[in-house]
Curated annotation (Swiss-Prot):
Name of this chain's protein: Thylakoid lumenal 14.7 kDa protein
Keyword Transmembrane: no
GO cellular component, one term: chloroplast thylakoid lumen
Keyword annotations from UniProtKB, A to Z: Chloroplast, Plastid, Thylakoid
Stretches the record annotates as Disordered: 1-20
Recorded superkingdom: Eukaryota
Biased composition (Basic and acidic residues): 9-20
Subcellular compartments: Plastid, Chloroplast thylakoid lumen
Organism this protein belongs to: Spinacia oleracea (Spinach)
Length: 20
C-alpha cells in the first residue's frame, strides 16, 4: 500500500483500502 490508488497494479480490494 503506497497510498496511491493504482487499480492497474493492485487488486480492487487493495485499491479500495487505499481509496478509503
Amino acid at each position: 500500500k503506497t497510498g496511491v490508488n493504482k487499480p492497474e497494479l493492485l487488486p480492487k480490494e487493495e485499491t479500495t483500502v487505499i481509496d478509503v
